[in-house]
């Protein structure tokens, strides 16, 4: 059974996330995450519509320059489960993740299966990060993107 997790992808302030995560209704969802045996996700690149929306929202609060600088300095390639990762699949050293609604990606170590669904070669950099970070046990991928993935093996 799916559960709606009605929070923003990124909070404007880390403190907002900390306060919300203490709420009992949110705690129930977080406990479900921690006891799941399967994760289904799709990697997101940083230029997707939802991430442009977040950047626009940040611009409205005067944070967009800071966010863009943080993304550049940490060399984020995309998102896995709404958590920023770098090209090696690392997420811990990306400060902006303190504002992300996604789980600690070490959660992936505790599940039997992590199914990654990918469509579109624009997600390849993030897919490579997800593969390097060992977040993928099963990959569902469209044929053109699969071809590009295979072709890119030598450069990654």
What are these regions (language model features)?
Residues 1-156:
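Conserved phosphate- and dinucleotide-binding cores of soluble alpha/beta proteins
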């Amino acid at each position: 059974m799916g559960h709606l997790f009605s929070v923003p992808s990124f909070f404007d302030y880390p403190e907002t996330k900390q306060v919300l995560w203490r709420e009992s209704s949110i705690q129930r969802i977080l406990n479900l995450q921690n006891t799941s045996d399967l994760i289904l996700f799709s990697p997101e690149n940083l230029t997707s519509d939802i991430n442009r929306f977040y950047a626009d929202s940040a611009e409205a609060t005067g944070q967009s320059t800071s966010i863009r600088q943080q993304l550049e300095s940490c060399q984020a390639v995309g998102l896995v489960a709404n958590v920023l990762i770098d090209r090696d699949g690392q997420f811990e050293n990306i400060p902006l993740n303190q504002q992300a609604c996604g789980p600690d990606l070490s959660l992936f170590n505790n599940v039997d299966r992590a199914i990654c669904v990918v469509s579109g070669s624009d997600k390849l950099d993030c897919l490579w990060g997800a593969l390097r970070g060992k977040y993928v046990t099963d990959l569902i991928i469209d044929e053109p993107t699969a071809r590009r993935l295979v072709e890119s093996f030598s450069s990654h």
